């Protein structure tokens, strides 16, 4: 008595257009393409149900809880202009559905199951609104932009980096030599590539030792603080932390993690260690395009960027707009603001579906990396501004005179662009002239 078994439409329970969202709700914007014959309201309700309390049939144990309190709600659906049978579904989730301080649990709940749902031809998570009531349960970046500048004693310009190439095959000693030449030439950072971990040709401990020697030698000769992103990513969390501990014992200022392949749990653990022990944390987004490149299915990078800010990282790769990797200018600047700023207004032209208030969570420096070189410097300086890292791999090591002259060229070009900008010159129009004048 009182329990009516059977399958019923999701929209009868989970489509609630009259719902007024709460300040504590986590809000999601999904781009959904229903299968032919599936109404948009049913598809949106299915997304809300399968990413919260629902299953395919009514169950007796529904009567032992309060679905009204815990269910996700599809509260709005809008058609996508210019697309046939495609919609943005807005879903509100009560805060109690999620474990505090766990990006892992957040993603397991919202995107863990629903993407294989057969009522949908395709589904993409476009944006999340993280309320302060939830974001305050995370430590966020280990240090943040201002603390990093204070640690490095570098202000008023973007920071310069370089990924050591070839990414695989160098011995530890030759790797250290390349690091020294780049840092001595004027770069602030050099970087392990994302797949440099601990391979037979270069074990991690040997690399760390030779890189530390290069760091201290270049610091002594230039009088500047230098860093190398020592990749601590490993097969286990225990091994990852062991490598981070060794980096700290050597006196290195920064370590690195591949946060998508390494996982959010490992990343958050490493971020806690870095905060407690004064290490900066550089984040590489290896594997992101598997998740974010398709327009209609997957997760947009702005969501992965928000997740990283909560999980913890001081730098993250964010595309270039001008280099070899894909990225639209306005959309890229949208998630760059989501990484750096405290308060970001809703702006659909930049792909920002919700106003995001990070309250006091530190910001993350966006890293522009991938196919960029010295002639891109004016555009990069204008697009990314001072709070960024501009990273030239082939654009440094590919210089015809060698690594150190490549580093010098990048540093001279950057300082010329910053000075020209500060003097009020138009970098977009005069960029090439500024670079040529600086090279004389």
Curated annotation (Swiss-Prot):
The modification N6,N6,N6-trimethyllysine is found at residue 4. Binds 1 Mg(2+) ion per subunit. PROSITE patterns: RUBISCO_LARGE. The modification N6-carboxylysine is found at residue 191. Substrate binds at residues 113, 163, 167, 285, 317, 369. Its EC number is 4.1.1.39. It is found in: Plastid, Chloroplast. RuBisCO catalyzes two reactions: the carboxylation of D-ribulose 1,5-bisphosphate, the primary event in carbon dioxide fixation, as well as the oxidative fragmentation of the pentose substrate in the photorespiration process. Both reactions occur simultaneously and in competition at the same active site. Belongs to the RuBisCO large chain family. Type I subfamily. PANTHER family: RIBULOSE BISPHOSPHATE CARBOXYLASE, RIBULOSE BISPHOSPHATE CARBOXYLASE LARGE CHAIN. This is Ribulose bisphosphate carboxylase large chain. It comes from Matteuccia struthiopteris.
């Amino acid at each position: 008595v009182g329990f009516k078994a059977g399958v019923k439409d999701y929209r009868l329970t989970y489509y609630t257009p009259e719902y007024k969202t709460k300040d504590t709700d986590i809000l999601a914007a999904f781009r959904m393409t229903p299968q032919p014959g599936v109404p948009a309201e049913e598809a949106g309700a299915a997304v809300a149900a399968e990413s919260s309390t629902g299953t395919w049939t009514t169950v007796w144990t529904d009567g032992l809880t309060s679905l009204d309190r815990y269910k996700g709600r599809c509260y709005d659906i809008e058609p996508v202009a210019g697309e046939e049978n495609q919609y943005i579904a807005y879903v509100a989730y009560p805060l109690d559905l999620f474990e505090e301080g766990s990006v892992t649990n957040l993603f397991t709940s919202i995107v863990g199951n629903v993407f294989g749902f057969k009522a949908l031809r395709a589904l993409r998570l476009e944006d999340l609104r993280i309320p302060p009531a939830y974001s305050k349960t995370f430590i966020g970046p280990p240090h943040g932009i201002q603390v990093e500048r204070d640690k490095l004693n570098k202000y008023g310009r973007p920071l310069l980096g370089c990924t050591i190439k070839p990414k695989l095959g160098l011995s530890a000693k030759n790797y250290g030599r390349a690091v020294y030449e780049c840092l001595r030439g004027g770069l602030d950072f050099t970087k392990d590539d994302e797949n440099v971990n601990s391979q037979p040709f270069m074990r991690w401990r040997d690399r760390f030792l030779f890189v530390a020697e290069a760091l201290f030698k270049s610091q002594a000769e230039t009088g500047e603080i230098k860093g190398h992103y020592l990749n601590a990513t490993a097969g286990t969390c225990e091994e990852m932390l062991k490598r981070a501990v060794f980096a700290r014992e050597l006196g290195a200022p920064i370590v690195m993690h591949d946060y998508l392949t390494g996982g959010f749990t490992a990343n958050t653990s490493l971020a806690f260690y870095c905060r407690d022990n004064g290490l900066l944390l550089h984040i590489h987004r290896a594997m992101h395009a598997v998740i974010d490149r398709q327009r209609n299915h997957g997760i947009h990078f702005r969501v992965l960027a928000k997740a990283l800010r909560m999980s913890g990282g001081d730098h993250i790769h964010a595309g270039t707009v001008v280099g070899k990797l894909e990225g639209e200018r306005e959309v890229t600047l949208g998630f760059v603001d989501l990484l750096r700023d405290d308060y970001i207004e809703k702006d659909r032209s930049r792909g920002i579906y919700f106003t995001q208030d990070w309250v006091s969570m530190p910001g993350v420096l966006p890293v522009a990396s991938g196919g960029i070189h010295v002639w891109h410097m004016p555009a990069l300086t204008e697009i990314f501004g001072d709070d960024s890292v501009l990273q030239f791999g082939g654009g440094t090591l590919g210089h015809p005179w060698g690594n150190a002259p490549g580093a010098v060229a990048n540093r001279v070009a950057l300082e010329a662009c910053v000075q020209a900008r500060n003097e009020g010159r138009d970098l977009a129009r005069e960029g090439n002239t500024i670079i040529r004048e600086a090279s004389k």
